[in-house]
């Protein structure tokens, strides 16, 4: 029941609150979004990082004339052109998009996980496609995470289904190779913002530093996830508190 989860999570990540630009918006106008961090105690360093990530995401998504500046202790003002529908853009720049690869704790039975039981050293992650009690237990710390991704692209698997292909940096490649070599035949979980996308078995050691995320993607949803991943994770989520159209 894990594959449908991809669509559900990407719906949250990419579609968010939809909103076409107000009537009369033309090429002489730009969109302004005022974003507020969901954490009131956000540090200046974290806000600087968030500003850079949002700027990269907007550029990678094809927005033009992008300007992203901090406003006060926990707000960011993003101004850009080239978008007729701001719904996907707002969701893309608002969510963390933190990707982690975990080893699954197979000692925890499904019933135990559903009841919220996990042994010391393990934790439970949500599996939205399995209902409100859908959970899976994972061990220790992530094998690799999104900070080790140097590239992410929309691609296709052998059956022609859209996927996202990832490439890790050298430390991530070594860690992924060690973990998969030591755990052939066991499952690992791929989680986006602590929600499990899929939990495939490790059929053989993965030594080349590449991985593929498959599921119920469309070409567009796979492309947007790839943009979010290669642009880097936000340190926390943001919410749009104001949207307006301004003259260039």
What are these model-derived regions, one by one?
Residues 217, 221-226:
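Catalytic P-loop NTP-binding/switch module of NTPases
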Residues 244-248:
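Conserved structured catalytic cores and adjacent interaction surfaces
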Residues 27-29, 34-202, 206-207, 211, ...:
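Non-transmembrane, solvent-exposed regions of membrane trafficking/translocation machinery
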Residues 17-20, 25:
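N-terminal Sec signal peptide cleavage junction
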């Amino acid at each position: 029941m894990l594959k449908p989860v991809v669509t559900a999570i990407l719906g949250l990540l990419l579609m968010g609150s939809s909103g076409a630009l107000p009537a009369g918006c033309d090429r002489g106008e730009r969109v302004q979004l005022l974003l507020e961090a969901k954490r009131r105690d956000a540090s200046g360093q974290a806000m600087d990082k968030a500003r850079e990530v949002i700027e990269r995401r907007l550029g990678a998504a094809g927005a033009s004339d992008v300007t992203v500046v901090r406003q006060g202790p926990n707000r960011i003002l993003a101004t850009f052109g080239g978008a007729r529908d701001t719904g996907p853009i707002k969701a893309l720049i608002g969510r963390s998009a933190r990707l982690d690869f975990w080893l699954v704790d197979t000692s925890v039975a499904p019933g135990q996980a559903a009841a919220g039981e996990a042994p010391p050293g393990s934790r439970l992650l949500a599996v939205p496609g399995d209902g409100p009690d859908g959970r899976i237990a994972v061990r220790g710390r992530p094998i690799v995470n999104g900070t080790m991704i140097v590239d992410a692209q929309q691609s296709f698997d052998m059956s022609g289904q859209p996927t996202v292909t990832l490439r890790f940096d050298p430390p991530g490649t070594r860690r992924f190779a060690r973990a998969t070599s030591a755990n052939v035949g066991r499952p690992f979980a791929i989680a986006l913002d602590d929600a499990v996308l899929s939990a495939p078995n490790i059929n053989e050691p993965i030594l080349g530093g590449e991985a593929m995320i498959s599921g119920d993607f469309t070409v567009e949803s796979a492309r947007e996830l790839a943009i979010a991943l290669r642009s880097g994770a936000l340190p926390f989520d943001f919410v749009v508190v104001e949207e307006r159209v301004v003259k260039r």
